[in-house]
Amino acid sequence: MNKKPTKDKANGAKATKTIALNKRARHEYHLEERYEAGLALQGWEIKAIRAGRANIVDGYAYVRSGEIYLIGAQITPLIQASTHTVPVERRDRKLLLHRAEIDKVLTRVEREGYTLVPTALYWSSNKVKLEIALAKGKQNHDKRDAAKERDWQRDKQRVMRRHNRDA
């Protein structure tokens, strides 16, 4: 009896479930290249993430001795989950990337002034993954331009709906 492997979604895409998003990153940075990285986590952190106690809004990534670490992301521990260890909510967590990706990111960060910003934390086939993006900070006038563009798109949609409804 050969059993065909089942696919989670159409076209072989894996099902992912978002744990946390960093919407502020889109507002404060010009996001360019995105990378998917694994996280080196402890057991209590996985339990807390399953309970939805993760926050990546204040986080950023940096390169230290050829490895990339996530700083400032908060995983609030469950009271009953960690009895034998002392949990640290905002500890540095190692990101797992291929060496070629680390080298590419390292050159862009050091030479071109980019920042590594976490944009999403999600499950991918029972593993926690972090999406990080190479980003450059926006100036205040860039933020205002983006807000004007959003308002214009919203007004345009409103006018089109009203026009289509009346016709």
Curated annotation (Swiss-Prot):
Domain of life: Bacteria
Compartment(s) of residence: Cytoplasm
Chief location bin: cytoplasm
CDD domains for this protein: SmpB
GO-annotated molecular function: RNA binding
Spans through the membrane: none
Keyword Cytoplasm recorded: yes
Entry-linked InterPro entries: SmpB, SsrA-bd_prot, SsrA-bd_prot_CS
A cellular component term, taken from the record's GO annotations: cytosol
GO BP annotations, alphabetical order: trans-translation
Region Disordered: start-end pairs: 139-167
Biased composition (Basic and acidic residues): 139-158
Gene3D superfamilies named among the record's database cross-references: 2.40.280.10
Xref: Pfam families: SmpB
Keywords: Cytoplasm, RNA-binding
Family named by the database record: Belongs to the SmpB family.
Its biological purpose: Required for rescue of stalled ribosomes mediated by trans-translation. Binds to transfer-messenger RNA (tmRNA), required for stable association of tmRNA with ribosomes. tmRNA and SmpB together mimic tRNA shape, replacing the anticodon stem-loop with SmpB. tmRNA is encoded by the ssrA gene; the 2 termini fold to resemble tRNA(Ala) and it encodes a 'tag peptide', a short internal open reading frame. During trans-translation Ala-aminoacylated tmRNA acts like a tRNA, entering the A-site of stalled ribosomes, displacing the stalled mRNA.
Protein name stated in the entry: SsrA-binding protein
Gene field: smpB
